[in-house]
Amino acid sequence: MSRYTGPSWKVSRRLGFSLSGTGKELSRRPYAPGQHGQDRRGSLSEYGLQLREKQKLRMTYGLTERQFSNLFKRAGKIREGKHGDNFMILLERRLDNVVYRLGLASTRRQARQLVNHGHITVDGKRVDIPSYEVEPGQVISLRERSKDLQIVKEALEAVVGRVPFVNFDENKMEGTLVRLPDREELDANIDEALVVEFYNR
């Protein structure tokens, strides 16, 4: 399955969940596209709830179905911790996500483009693979020629706070994944247990 590249607000309205994290997509029209007036989603079956939760998580991080399911399988091979928690941590360790968490991009999609176009370095070496798994302590930065990109400047100006498991040096324009996140520090509106149930059904 290919990656969705259309308007994220449409997906947000369909899922009843803000992919941007701002809630703006749902503030004016809190119902699915094609519906008018009140939300007519109705009650979902157990499978429907599991599927919706899986789609919420997959679309939040911008992965294809294959990437998502492969990462889920990897999480299942980690011996310590819960499957769902480990899955969330692996999603957070993706390079495109860390770039987003550092504030170098306004959205994960924008962060993925920065990585794809060769603007990002890890420990001083250019890395253009969005799925690259970042280790705690690795230094994430912009290439020298990329530090004046307007989209980066705008993203940094819009930052109002960062998650506690990353650190960013505004002067050096570089940051690190300080440690692996705790589940409590990630989106509370995602129920990863339903995602585990979906794949284990």
From Swiss-Prot:
Gene Ontology MF: a single term: rRNA binding
Enumerate the spans annotated as S4 RNA-binding domain.
Answer: 93-156
- What are the protein's UniProt keywords? Ribonucleoprotein, Ribosomal protein, RNA-binding, rRNA-binding
**Taxonomic superkingdom:** Bacteria
Output the Gene Ontology cellular-component terms.
small ribosomal subunit
| Biological process according to GO | ribosomal small subunit biogenesis; translation
InterPro entries, A to Z: Ribosomal_uS4, Ribosomal_uS4_bac-type, Ribosomal_uS4_CS, Ribosomal_uS4_N, S4_RNA-bd, S4_RNA-bd_sf
Q: Where is this region: Disordered?
A: 20-46
Family affiliation? Belongs to the universal ribosomal protein uS4 family.
Q: What does this protein do?
A: One of the primary rRNA binding proteins, it binds directly to 16S rRNA where it nucleates assembly of the body of the 30S subunit. With S5 and S12 plays an important role in translational accuracy.
Q: How does it assemble?
A: Part of the 30S ribosomal subunit. Contacts protein S5. The interaction surface between S4 and S5 is involved in control of translational fidelity.
Protein name as annotated: Small ribosomal subunit protein uS4
Q: Which organism is it from?
A: Ligilactobacillus salivarius (strain UCC118) (Lactobacillus salivarius)
Gene name linked to the record: rpsD
